[in-house]
């Protein structure tokens, strides 16, 4: 893991298209501004993990439904 120190209004560049800028520091909270192309999904990690869990659950359900339908067809 790369660890960088930045002050307010300083940024890091990720590739050619993504900039992460420190907007504010208030107590133990850091506000970041992220400038990225619209096709790049940006989520808080806990939201991203929830999305992944839901996608996995939906995929498992889909395979169960397909199995049930194919067994009824026989």
From Swiss-Prot:
GO terms for molecular function: mRNA 5'-UTR binding. Changing residue 32 to P: In sow-10; suppresses the motility loss and flagellar assembly defect of an fliW deletion. A translational regulator that binds mRNA to regulate translation initiation and/or mRNA stability. Usually binds in the 5'-UTR at or near the Shine-Dalgarno sequence preventing ribosome-binding, thus repressing translation. Represses expression of flagellin (hag) in a post-transcriptional fashion. Specifically binds to 2 sites in the 5'-UTR of hag mRNA in a cooperative fashion; the second site overlaps the Shine-Dalgarno sequence and prevents 30S ribosomal subunit binding. Mutation of either binding site abolishes CsrA regulation of hag expression. The gene is csrA. InterPro entries: CsrA (IPR003751), CsrA_sf (IPR036107). This is Translational regulator CsrA. SUPFAM superfamilies: CsrA-like (SSF117130). Contacts FliW via its C-terminus (residues 49-58). Changing residue 55 to D: Inhibits motility and flagellar filament assembly, greatly reduced binding of FliW. Binds 5'-UTR of hag mRNA, is not completed by FliW. It comes from Bacillus subtilis (strain 168). Belongs to the CsrA/RsmA family. Induction: Part of the SigD-controlled yvyF-csrA operon and the SigA-controlled fliW-csrA operon. Expressed from the SigA operon at low levels during log phase, with a 5-fold increase as the culture transitions to stationary phase, peaking 1 hour later. Changing residue 58 to V: Inhibits motility and flagellar filament assembly, reduced binding of FliW. It comes from the Bacteria.
């Amino acid at each position: 893991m790369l660890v960088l120190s930045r002050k307010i209004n300083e940024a890091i560049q990720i590739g050619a298209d993504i900039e992460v800028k420190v907007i504010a520091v208030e107590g133990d909270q850091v506000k970041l501004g992220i400038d990225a192309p619209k096709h790049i999904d940006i989520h808080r990690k806990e939201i991203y993990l929830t999305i992944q869990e839901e996608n996995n659950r939906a995929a498992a359900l889909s395979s169960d439904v397909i199995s049930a339908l194919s067994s009824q067809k026989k």
